[in-house]
Amino acid sequence: MICGVDEAGKGSVLGPMVVAAVGCTDMDDLIALGVADSKKLSSKSREKISADIKAQFPFSIVIRTAHDIDELRRTMTMNEIVARSHAEALIPLNCTCAYVDACDVSEERYEETVSSFSPPDCTIVARHKADSLFPPVSAASIIAKVERDRIIEELSKEYGDIGSGYPSDPVTITYLTKYIRHHNQPPVIARSSWETVKNLLHQKNQSSLLDF
């Protein structure tokens, strides 16, 4: 069986990173569902196709919470965390070949890193922009994004409007800034190891010193 792996939320400062893997014996079966790069699909299209993929193909999902990522970053780089998560998503599917989206400038180096966490009988092929090259990766990308969007929506219901969770989102930064200002610490859904959080904490501490 051939598999594809991709993640959503690697660079977000709030919420989890979601990794999905999808298996198939014939890529044309995935193409027939309308699988494409998840970024090019509307939210409704992603949700429908994600449901179709889950109903017809084997898949697995690995979720790394903000706390998980902070703990792992004590001893691993973010690329290593993603590689390990990619490998963990592949294991339940027992595939012989897996296409993964390369999270390193060097495709070969990323292949080696994922392989180091993967079963020895699974060949890893890492490519940049794999989600637009290989249907199984496109399918995994869709599932990962839909699952992450669902989680972010749930977090927003619990914590208030957190935006997309990415540092580039003004809504996310406004939420983080206000939370840190009022609580003197980041929320549990924040990745405290991120420079974004460290900078906001530093600004809060500097402001407190000036007030004093």
UniProtKB/Swiss-Prot annotation:
Residues 1-206 form the RNase H type-2 domain. GO terms for cellular component: cytoplasm; ribonuclease H2 complex. Manganese or magnesium. Binds 1 divalent metal ion per monomer in the absence of substrate. May bind a second metal ion after substrate binding. GO terms for biological process: DNA replication, removal of RNA primer; mismatch repair. GO terms for molecular function: manganese ion binding; RNA binding; RNA-DNA hybrid ribonuclease activity. It catalyses: Endonucleolytic cleavage to 5'-phosphomonoester. Its cofactor is Mn(2+); Mg(2+). Keywords: Cytoplasm, Endonuclease, Hydrolase, Manganese, Metal-binding, Nuclease. Belongs to the RNase HII family. HAMAP family: RNase_HII_A. Endonuclease that specifically degrades the RNA of RNA-DNA hybrids. This is Ribonuclease HII.
